Curated annotation (Swiss-Prot):
HAMAP family: GatA. The keyword ATP-binding applies. This is Glutamyl-tRNA(Gln) amidotransferase subunit A. It comes from the Bacteria. The lineage of its organism: Bacteria, Bacillati, Bacillota, Clostridia, Eubacteriales. GO terms for cellular component: glutamyl-tRNA(Gln) amidotransferase complex. It comes from Clostridium botulinum (strain 657 / Type Ba4).
Length: 485
């Protein structure tokens, strides 16, 4: 039995039945990482000794017949912008190279409390800015389905770790699609929860009104399991909602009779690959066969979402990244004349091109004379987009669309074409701007590459997403796909 190919719920079953030890599971994954990660590039840091130590502790509890917790013995990878005490937290940037976190993020605390085994920190686009993980300062992450293609981004390492069987579960962050798009490209399940459903405390900020931690897994049940473990109120993050977290496992049923699904025409227009369109339309038919009522709908303001997103997120990034100045921690230039020179050279040398591009854009739209014309207007557009979604959700339980207009593109294909790269998030960005939840799951294969189906629902209706996603998933076999790597 290849333990690395099993889902989290399958591992939980054999662990609780004492068919396998937690240490055996952990060593299987560490061996897998040592075997393949030099080609896949999922990990920036592996915590081998600590992982084995935790596994042995769990085995001791099992021997005493103590009750297992939600994630007991399950290997988890953490994106390298989410703090884990004692591990590096570089955000895949030269400016934070060598930085070790002195504390745990709230989501990390919750994973540890539920006895998940953290294997290490995962590769990403620098400061979560990118759609291909080509912006990492340290190494490329590659798609397990085709090593010449990108895994998506910015949570590319998180997707690769799960798809490449280097972790059972992983955490990413999603600001404009950074969990859903790599989940689509790598053929796994990824959730962007409602803004405020999961704490951002201890997550390095990119766009503070957009950032959300998102769980990733091999199937919908795994994703629901991890969401249940990490969701809920956190007093350290005032944006988290004081709303009870439902038992998402109860939503995992094929019964979706009477559920109303809208198909927005704006997500099926120009730029959508015809083969992707066909795969998504076939998935919609399956949902209809399972009892859902499917009707067309319209979200006319979606064309403005991408522009609003890049103005708002870049403005917030320019403010958030001002703290990285070469003084208290992180990279400091060795050649400087005075304090101002330290700031200038440390940031110029420490940040990559995409990060500098977004800082400049953000500083520009916040500057005198342009604030009203760009930033203030983008906030107004954001409000209108939220209203657009609320109007549609009065008539529908969910909206269905492609996750990305294409399958995974080749490494280097869009690296120097900024607009083309930004457009790869055209179907995920509107959801982030509105703050509503969405899930991506595999719905087909095109020329050996996975296609992603995106299901979107109203605020705090993750249970609806899990219900619809599970119903579709269990009606097809795409969730059983494993990259032959």
């Amino acid at each position: 039995m290849d333990l690395t190919k099993l889902t989290a719920h399958e591992l939980k079953d054999i662990l609780s039945n004492k068919e396998v030890k937690a240490e055996e599971i952990t060593r299987a994954f560490l061996d897998r990482i040592n075997l393949v990660d030099n080609k896949l590039g999922a990990y920036l840091y592996v915590s081998e000794e600590e992982a084995i130590k935790k596994a042995k502790e769990i085995d001791g509890k099992i021997e005493k017949n103590e009750e297992l917790k939600a994630l007991s013995g399950i290997p988890v990878g953490i994106k390298d912008n989410i703090n884990v005490k004692g591990m590096q937290n570089t955000c895949a940037s030269k400016i934070l190279q060598g930085y070790t976190s002195p504390y745990d993020a709230h989501v990390t605390e919750k994973i540890k409390k539920e006895e998940g085994i953290i294997l290490g920190k995962l590769n990403m686009d620098e400061f979560a800015m990118g759609s291909s993980t080509e912006n990492s300062a340290f190494k490329l992450a590659k798609n397990p389905w085709d090593l010449e293609r990108v895994p998506g981004g910015s949570s590319g390492g998180s997707a690769v770790a799960v798809a490449g069987c280097e972790a059972t579960l992983s955490l990413g962050t999603d600001t404009g699609g950074s969990v859903r798009q790599p989940a689509s490209f790598c053929g796994i399940v990824g959730l962007k929860p409602t803004y405020g459903r999961i704490s951002r405390s201890g997550v390095v900020a990119f766009g503070s009104t957009l950032d959300q931690v998102g769980p990733m897994g091999k199937d919908v049940e795994d994703c629901a399991l991890l969401t249940s473990a990490i969701a809920g109120l956190d007093k350290k993050d005032f944006t988290t909602a004081d709303k009870e977290v439902p038992d998402y496992k109860k939503s995992l049923t094929k019964d979706i009779k009477g559920k109303k699904i809208g198909i927005p025409k704006e997500f099926f227009g120009e730029g959508l690959d015809e083969k992707v369109r066909k795969s998504v339309e076939e998935a919609i038919k399956v949902l209809e066969e399972n009892g859902a009522e499917v009707k067309p709908c319209s979200l006319p303001l979606m064309d403005y979402a991408l522009s609003a997103y890049y103005i708002i997120s870049s403005a917030e990034a320019s403010s958030n990244l001002a703290r990285f100045d070469g003084i208290r921690y992180g990279y400091r230039s060795k050649n400087f004349k005075d304090a101002q020179d330290i700031y200038l050279k440390s940031r110029s040398e420490g940040f990559g091109d995409e990060v500098k591009r977004r800082i400049m854009l953000g500083t520009y739209v916040l500057s005198a004379g342009y604030y009203d014309a760009y930033y203030k207007k983008a906030l107004k557009v954001r409000k209108l987009i939220k209203d657009d979604f609320q109007r549609v959700f009065k008539d529908f339980d969910a909206i269905v669309s492609p996750t990305s207009p294409t399958t995974a593109f080749k490494v280097g294909e869009k690296k120097d074409d900024v607009m083309s790269m930004y457009l790869s998030d055209i179907y995920t960005v509107p959801i982030s701007v509105a703050g509503v939840p969405a899930i991506s799951l595999p719905c087909g294969m095109i020329d050996g590459l996975p296609v992603g189906l995106q299901i979107i629902s109203d605020y705090f209706k993750e249970n609806v997403l899990f219900n619809l996603a599970y119903s579709y998933e269990q009606s097809v076999d795409f969730y059983k796909m494993r990259a032959d790597f």
